């Protein structure tokens, strides 16, 4: 089991690093635009990219393009796994990354924000 909170995936160690506890429900509701199918889901994946991590390799805008592609691939894989395990997934791209980042203890301007994917049991 895993405690509620914000976690950052560490690719070198293939582990989750705890960042912070979840913010109050009201702030989360505001951050996702009061979309009930997202607010009430038990699991949320937020796909982000950090240009600083790969800028040494791609010294141009290729690093940004590469991050967008990776964010897209990751979002697709999360949704495919949810479907394969008979769960419902819903992705949104309009959310308040500033609220989420602030509560997670991150500088929201340092990342490329992709999608927020809510995953939960099917309603049927």
Regions found by a protein language model. Give the residues of each.
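Acidic, surface-exposed loops and disordered segments
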Residues: 1-124
């Amino acid at each position: 089991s895993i405690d509620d909170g914000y976690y950052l995936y560490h690719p070198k160690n293939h582990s989750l690093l705890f960042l912070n506890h979840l913010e109050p429900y009201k702030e989360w509701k505001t951050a996702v635009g009061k979309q009930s199918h997202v607010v009430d889901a038990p699991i949320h994946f937020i796909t982000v990219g950090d240009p600083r991590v790969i800028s040494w390799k791609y010294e141009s805008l290729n690093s940004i393009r590469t991050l967008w592609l990776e964010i897209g691939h990751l979002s697709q894989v999360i949704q495919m796994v949810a479907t394969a395990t008979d769960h419902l997934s819903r992705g949104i791209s309009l959310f308040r990354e500033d609220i989420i980042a602030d509560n997670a203890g991150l500088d929201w301007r340092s990342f490329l924000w992709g999608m927020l994917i809510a995953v939960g049991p099917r309603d049927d």
